[in-house]
Amino acid sequence: MAQGILVSTRKGLFEVTRGRSGWTVKDGFFLGDNVSLALHDPRDGTDYATINHGHFGVKLHRRLKGKKWTEVATPKYPEKPEGLVDLDGWGKPVKWTTQMIWALEIAGPNTIWCGTMPGGLFRSTDRGETWELMENLWSHPDRNKWLGGGADIPGIHSICVDPRDSNVVRVAVSCGGVWVTKDNGVSWAQSAHGMKFDNGPKSEAESPDGQDPHMMVQSPSDPKKFWVQHHAGIFKSVNDGKKWTSVKAKPSSFGFGVVVHPKDADTAWFVPGIKDEKRIPVDGAMVVTRTRDGGKTFKILKKGLPQKHAYDVVFRHGLAIDDAGKCLVMGSTTGNLWVSENQGDSWDNVSSTLPQIYAVRWA
């Protein structure tokens, strides 16, 4: 059973551990700072934390196993060529600066991938000492079709490294669809065909470049299968992302986070809500939905979750599952942190007083 959780919040990074009496918030780091994301690397026990200091920029910190946190290199964009007109899908100038680190994933030996706003993808082959921008994705002419969704600027929030071949990597962009490389970043192709958005011109609804996937996950046990929580609902692919099909769930198909069972590609969890202007749980009742049959049916899971006057939203990185597929953790915008040790059948509230939670990760 998993024993630790890294919780990234608006006011610091918190470690949560499991003892004899249950789950407890143990230590806090970078208190008062905006910690957008954390990563635990099981290869050597190293932890990474990204901090957004606003005016003072984005920083990346690393903690070797048993050591103190130290600052390491932050992914950095090259200087924008003089005279280059670089506009996003809204027609706004693109700033060539790291404005947020939105995704971190481990890959091959010593390799870490990093997704950022305004849409640059970086790779480190020395565990964060140095970073390389994937120039062929950044310079792709279709990048200028990307636009901001919930944020004002586009960003890469999901990175799926294929367990069969680490040279194959897929990234999801809000809003810019899904992109895949099969040669370790040398070339890239759009892979959001079949997705459909419902908040724009009908003539453009199925354009892959305008899709807004909120979160994408790949099945470790059956890597040709993917799940996406999209702005316009739930989508799945059973053929390596070549084609996506819509899946309907109640009480809502809208949400941000999704996780897939590590040993069963047809089992996945979502946190539904009312979309767009509202972005609150349906009827003020906090629930999780789970499918065990590839999206044909869903079960509403609510034991231990508030069913009246609940206004929690779970962000795209606010839901996580452990490697055994038994324990889930979920953190909300109101500072609630819940853990389930039975695949979501029931939930225990670990804390209701944390700052706004951006992301959770098992460690």
Where are the model-predicted features located?
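Extracellular glycan-interacting surfaces
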Residues: 1-363
